[in-house]
Swiss-Prot record:
Co-factor binding details: Binds 2 Zn(2+) ions per subunit.
Residues the entry annotates as binding substrate: H62, F63, R64, N94, H309, P323, G324
Name of this protein: Dihydroorotase
Gene designation: pyrC
Catalysed reactions, as listed in the record: (S)-dihydroorotate + H2O = N-carbamoyl-L-aspartate + H(+)
Species of origin: Sulfurihydrogenibium sp. (strain YO3AOP1)
Length: 423
């Protein structure tokens, strides 16, 4: 048995936003009351000053397995996930080979279950080999356990293919998610087209490369009546397009990454390849737009786009180095900062970190409720910690946050009634 004492529980699903004790027996939440007395043989966790929420779900991570496990693998990725308070993650299909066949889908699920730290689920490719030419066998992949379809890392440039994919996935009760980038506009750009790129002489990547593809996908959703999900939305205009599409009745959802809520293109001022990400880091105006869109519900939830790369890969010259940065361990402190700055409250934080992403992939969100299996995150909202190579649990350490201090630290993560992470 485990008794969690004195923690402040936040779970809008059960109208909880107060200080309670939680008694967990054989993995199940037995009691949620004030002043539960400890007894012999019971592990007591003193959560005074801590916040307890349902554990988090991230529908967009890159665990690089199969094919690039020198960057990350399912075990190291799972360790990073639970250290960030996550108990469900969805792996992207830009592996080697791509997740476009049933055996690879099964491999991801079985490997995650074998490790057992968190729920590791696969997405599957929209097109074979992620080449944008021919649709995968979506029905077979979904039956094998793929939770949705995406060619993430690359857009679906062919609008006819994208329309057919939306119709096929929608008929199966799932959805497609698009990496919205018009390659004819982005060319080989590396930094947001603006003052910073111009001053540094960096190849510019215009925001229209994202905006036009977001508009296309939203229009296809309106016309077909089928759902579409916008990955890592990052521009003010894209936010406005999604708001318009939702007002038109489109079944469109959107995610935003922690780095697009927190970091700007000023990270390039030291010419650091660590700052290269796709879509690129944007301006303060774009960040402000995404923050308020997340608060209002135009953006539905947070997804980290956790993208590990080896040190030597990120030390190449800008055009050669791969885009991407870590995110799983930094999402909580970044989103929590928005709570502290009054963009939204803790209830909304739980919505965007836990409830809405779980619902999006058809899962019942974790709940803090008597009779439920404990899937909880306990964090200290005021603990400051340094991001360094020791505190990062991923194999790779590629983040512009190295050496910086963040406030908000996960102390315990419960998965299927067991403690899978303790700080």
């Amino acid at each position: 048995m485990i008794l969690i004492k004195n923690g402040h529980i936040v779970d809008p699903q059960n109208n909880l936003n107060d200080k309670f004790d939680i008694l967990i027996e054989k993995g199940e939440i037995k009691k949620i009351e004030k002043n539960i007395q400890p007894f012999a043989g019971c592990e007591v966790i003193d959560a005074e000053g801590k916040i307890i929420t349902p554990s988090f779900t991230d529908i967009h991570v890159h665990f690089r397995d199969p094919g690039q496990t020198y960057k990350e693998d399912i075990e190291s990725g799972s360790k990073a996930a639970v250290a960030g308070g996550y108990t469900t993650v969805v792996c992207m299909p830009n592996t080697i080979p791509a997740i476009d066949d049933v055996p690879i889908v099964r491999y991801i699920i079985e490997k995650g279950e074998e490790i057992g730290l968190c729920r590791v689920l696969p997405s599957a490719a929209i097109t074979k080999g992620r080449k944008g030419k021919e649709l995968t066998e979506m029905a077979l992949l979904k039956d094998a356990g793929a939770v949705y379809f995406t060619d993430d890392g690359a857009p679906v440039m062919d609008s006819f293919i994208m329309r057919k994919a939306m119709e096929y996935a929608g008929s199966l009760g799932t959805f497609v998610a698009d990496h919205c980038e018009d390659l004819n506009l982005s060319q080989n750009g590396v930094a947001h087209e603006g003052e910073i790129a111009a001053a540094l002489g960096l190849p510019p990547l215009p925001p229209e490369a994202e905006d036009t593809m977001v508009a296309r996908d939203c229009i296809l959703s309106i016309q077909t009546g089928m759902p579409v999900h916008i990955c890592h939305i990052s521009t003010k205009l894209s936010v406005e397009i999604v708001a318009w599409a939702k007002a038109m009745g489109a079944k469109v959802t959107a995610e935003v990454t922690p780095h697009h809520l927190y970091l700007t293109d000023e990270e390039f001022l030291d010419f650091s390849c660590i700052a290269k990400v796709s879509p690129p880091l944007r301006t303060h105006e774009d960040i402000e737009a995404t923050r308020w869109a997340l608060a209002s519900g135009i953006i539905d939830f947070v997804a980290t786009d956790h993208a590990p790369h080896a040190h030597y890969e990120k030390m190449q010259e800008l055009q050669a180095c791969p885009p991407g940065m870590l995110g799983l361990q930094f999402a909580l402190p970044i989103v929590l900062e928005l709570v502290k700055k009054d963009y939204f409250d803790l209830n909304r934080m739980v919505e965007v970190m836990s409830i809405q992403p779980a619902k999006k992939i058809g899962l019942k969100p974790p709940q803090i409720k008597e009779g439920e299996i404990a899937e909880l995150t306990i964090f200290d909202p005021f603990e400051t910690w340094e991001v360094n190579k020791e505190t990062i649990l991923s194999k790779s350490k590629n983040t512009p946050l190295l050496g910086r201090k963040l406030t908000g630290k996960v102390k315990y993560t419960f998965f299927k009634g067991k403690i899978v992470y303790r700080d």
